[in-house]
Amino acid sequence: MSDGAVVRALVLEAPRRLVVRQYRLPRIGDDDALVRVEACGLCGTDHEQYTGELAGGFAFVPGHETVGTIAAIGPRAEQRWGVSAGDRVAVEVFQSCRQCANCRGGEYRRCVRHGLADMYGFIPVDREPGLWGGYAEYQYLAPDSMVLRVAGDLSPEVATLFNPLGAGIRWGVTIPETKPGDVVAVLGPGIRGLCAAAAAKGAGAGFVMVTGLGPRDADRLALAAQFGADLAVDVAIDDPVAALTEQTGGLADVVVDVTAKAPAAFAQAIALARPAGTVVVAGTRGVGSGAPGFSPDVVVFKELRVLGALGVDATAYRAALDLLVSGRYPFASLPRRCVRLEGAEDLLATMAGERDGVPPIHGVLTP
């Protein structure tokens, strides 16, 4: 498509106001690129943006799990990223200046130049060229973008799992240093919970338990065994501490809490950890929500290691793409709902619990 051609994008102008706007494609220079979006995965962040629970600088084009084909690329960008026009790529949410101490140390989530302000799917449209997210037919890639090549035999829809699976690998294995034989408990059976279970089992965990809550999680818990779980527990029915102890004779070496808007889950994560165990907290609770039932003294008496987890890095993303290509787990057959631009609002409302029916485990926008 030529420079100046008109393309469509979905713009979130305000909470629950998602509209189609037209944008002209920018001229690509030596250091930037343009991606034809084939698929963009949706997660909890997307529906929190949609409802306004996650405050943003309206208006913006959402979408931070983009997979697409390079439509145009400058020569220096081609050399920097190691990709060419026609290659399928996954676009990381963070940008990296590649120069500050954080970026040189691999912590580009904390890039001094970009940080959280320049995440794809969050940048206001009044910053040219406006096409800063995956809810669009084309997405602009700035010079400091981070992209990964996607194998040609991996469908774009499945490839969008590079993001949640990368999170599962980093949160469930890398950060807690999960070892072969470890007992791992994953709280939350959403896409990132299933991915964390798969990653832990893939790293050699001896036993993996996944927990959920009530009918909304029933289908997800039923899938857990296909993604590495040895035990799935509905905490509305059974005590997860008792269930894990019965199966393993003890508590978890590693607990990964990926629940969202579930304040009481943190106390449960602490209860599930063995003395000197590790608890990774990746699910956010919302400002001011607190942690009902949590006593800091338990952390002291059990000498727990409690670690926060923010985002993913290139190492985990590459491992995720390799795992997807391997076919070890049935990610391709995950129950997913794919929609065009016109169907995005209904899908987001469903994921936010504002429509009848159970939200899909994997939501994908295919512009």
UniProtKB/Swiss-Prot annotation:
Binding site for Zn(2+) 1: C43, H64, N163
InterPro entries: ADH-like_C, ADH-like_N, ADH_Zn_CS, GroES-like_sf, NAD(P)-bd_dom_sf, Zn_alcohol_dh
Enzyme class name: oxidoreductase
Reaction equation(s) it catalyzes: a primary alcohol + NAD(+) = an aldehyde + NADH + H(+); a secondary alcohol + NAD(+) = a ketone + NADH + H(+)
Similarity field: Belongs to the zinc-containing alcohol dehydrogenase family.
GO molecular function, one term: alcohol dehydrogenase (NAD+) activity
PANTHER family to which the protein is assigned, alphabetical: L-THREONINE 3-DEHYDROGENASE
Protein species of origin: Mycobacterium tuberculosis (strain ATCC 25618 / H37Rv)
Keyword annotations of the record: Metal-binding, NAD, Oxidoreductase, Zinc
Cofactor: how bound: Binds 2 Zn(2+) ions per subunit.
Transmembrane feature ranges: none
Domain of life: Bacteria
Required cofactor(s): Zn(2+)
Protein name: Probable alcohol dehydrogenase adh
Binding site for Zn(2+) 2: C97, C100, C103, C111
Additional free-text comment from the UniProt record: Was identified as a high-confidence drug target.
Stored Pfam families: ADH_N (PF08240), ADH_zinc_N (PF00107)
Keyword Repeat: no
EC numbers for this chain: 1.1.1.1
